[in-house]
């Protein structure tokens, strides 16, 4: 339990928290959302760990290493080994120009990073997210994400 309040009302899901806690869990059955979950875990107080992440290595890119490198390049406290991700509390992310390995999920992670960064994040090849989520950028913008050039 990371300390989030999750509400489902009128067809909308909302998640809010004022004091996230770091947790440990297995990523074995949810590889496609682990990059974004890793970002959230960075903002939990304490040390976080996601185990059983080895499937991330055989996606469009090595998402295990890519996730850690991307978040770390923006100032996040995150590392990985052969099969796990480790985080510790990160107050905020900084700006950056990101090259994200030709992988649609890594671009979506970069977009999520932009929502908590203190400054602009530039992402290359934004069109590739259409592979799994054609309306991603429209939905991102409708939820308050700022977009230039999409």
Question: Could you say what each language-model-derived stretch is?
Answer:
Residues 1-150:
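Short, structured segments at the rim of ligand-binding sites
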């Amino acid at each position: 339990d990371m300390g989030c309040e999750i509400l489902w009302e009128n067809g909308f899901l909302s998640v809010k928290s004022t004091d996230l806690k770091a947790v440990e869990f297995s990523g074995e059955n949810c590889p496609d959302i682990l990059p974004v979950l890793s970002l959230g875990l960075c903002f939990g107080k304490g040390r976080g760990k996601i185990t059983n992440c080895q499937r991330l290595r055989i996606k469009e890119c090595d998402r295990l290493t890519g996730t850690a490198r991307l978040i770390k390049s923006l100032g996040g406290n995150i590392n990985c080994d052969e099969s796990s991700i480790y985080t510790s509390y990160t107050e905020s992310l900084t700006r950056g120009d990101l090259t994200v390995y030709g992988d649609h999920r890594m671009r979506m992670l970069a977009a999520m990073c932009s929502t908590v960064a203190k400054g602009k994040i530039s992402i290359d090849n934004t069109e590739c997210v259409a592979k799994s989520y054609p309306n991603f950028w429209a939905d991102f913008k409708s939820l308050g994400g700022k977009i230039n050039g999409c």
